Amino acid sequence: MINGGDYFKNEILLISMATLYLWYSFRYARKTNLEELEIPTKKIIGQFLVTFLISQLFYYTGIQFLQIQSDSSASFAENISHGYSLSLMLSVSVISPIEEELFLRGFVQKGGFRNSWLGIFLTSSFFSLLHVPNDALSFIYYALSGFIYGTSYKYSKTLWVPILCHIGHNTIIVVRSFFYT
């Protein structure tokens, strides 16, 4: 890890490396015809809004009633206790969602499983494991979040919908942390 978990250390290097990695990932996805990353149409924007609304309703239900906990949320809380850094906010709200969606939905779900329901189920489970849930209920919660993103990709046929939903979701978490920490 470039910053050793300290988002203030080597902040510019971390942002530069992540930007380079994302640029290369998008380039690779386009070159291999894994995904047509064109400007989103009105239909795609509509699909994004519906999926985002569903994911946010699901998120607030999980937060209000289920007390979902994971090592990734605990790590985020620990990092912001030391203050906010640009690299932390970009990593959580933009970089990680793009990386996760390109890899899980693009490479694994579409590339490995041809966008099948089995692929959605497996990538949803892997998505949950990436967030290191602390109990079975948290695992199910994160897997269902992954299922929402995977299903949105299957029906929209573009990575823009799950990418934008995931970015929006994580950005709301970052913004909420300004007010509730």
Positions of predicted regions on the chain:
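Alpha-helical transmembrane segments of multipass membrane proteins
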Residues: 1, 17-21, 51-59, 169, ...
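Alpha-helical transmembrane segments in multi-pass membrane proteins
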Residues: 1-29
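Juxtamembrane/transmembrane-helix boundary motifs at the membrane-water interface
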Residues: 1-12, 64, 69-74, 175-181
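Membrane-interface helix-boundary motifs at transmembrane edges
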Residues: 4-6, 31-42, 107-114, 153
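Non-cytosolic membrane-interface motifs at loop->transmembrane helix junctions
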Residues: 6-13, 72-79, 138-149
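C-terminal ends of transmembrane helices
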Residues: 27-33, 100-104
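Juxtamembrane helix-loop-helix connectors linking adjacent transmembrane helices
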Residues: 31-96
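Transmembrane helix-loop-helix hairpins at the membrane interface
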Residues: 85-181
